[in-house]
Amino acid sequence: MIGELCRSAFCLGILLFASVLWGQELRLGTTYTVEDSGLLKVLVPAFERARSIKVRAVLAGTGQVLRIAEKGDVDVVFSHSPADEEKFVAAGFGVARFDVMYNDFVIVGPAADPTGIRGEKDAVGAFKKIHARRAKFVSRGDDSGTHKKEQFLWRSAGLVPKWPDYLSTGQGMVRVLLMAGELQAYTLCDRATFSAQRAKAGLEILSSGDPRLRNEYGVIAVNPARHPHVNRQGAQAFVEWITSEAGQHLISNYRIGGEQVFFPGAKSRR
């Protein structure tokens, strides 16, 4: 009898704990690329089922996501600009950064390829050709991880992207792809979003394969010492889950048109 009562009390405790977690939503700050690729729609429901924690996604470019997190307006960050994420942690806004996954960026453009970059393995060389021809180029211009990578490539080329047909939009990746398609322009895009939007954009991958185009994603719990109100338990649960075998398996198995667009990368801590 006592044993039954203990077991009942134990089970009740678990249920109450789970209900508390479910009642306190987790605010996940993440990027448009995770949403636009469709991956977020796979990860969030799986996490909610596994940990009984309700998730509310807050979407923005990486730079904006980190600024939102600095204010304590999200509990955990899932983004793709390692250098900025490391600065975020070093400044005391995040607990620690963990690698989650990676893919790559690609330079896409019209099939006619007026600059002749098709097959170019040197991304900086491709940007130099685009600049030399003053070709149409649509930029995110939004301080996102993709925009930061584009800026890195221009700096590496020793060039300033400023000519009449260089358009800085301040828009998300899908809108930029559609604009580039309408204008028959070039742009830099993460491979996953391009795979998801290829048919609508009407563009082609023209340059890829440069190691400098690697696109790494990390996860960071917002520091409760800086913002005591954050959902500390929920954030830690998300970090543990997405870097676990279960989370990594979902990432590895995610496909767009049969193509693997993300690769598990939860190996090291930054």
Model features per residue range: what roles?
Residues 9, 44, 104:
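Short amphipathic alpha-helical/adjacent loop interface patches that line ligand
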Residues 1-6:
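N-terminal secretory signal peptides that target proteins for export/translocation
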Residues 88-96:
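Hydrophobic/aromatic-rich structural module bridging two neighboring secondary-structure elements via a short loop
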Residues 8-20:
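Bacterial N-terminal signal peptides
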Residues 22-54, 58, 63, 67-73, ...:
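Exported/periplasmic ABC-transporter solute-binding proteins
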Residues 75-76, 95-108:
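Short, glycine-/small- and polar/acidic-enriched structural segments
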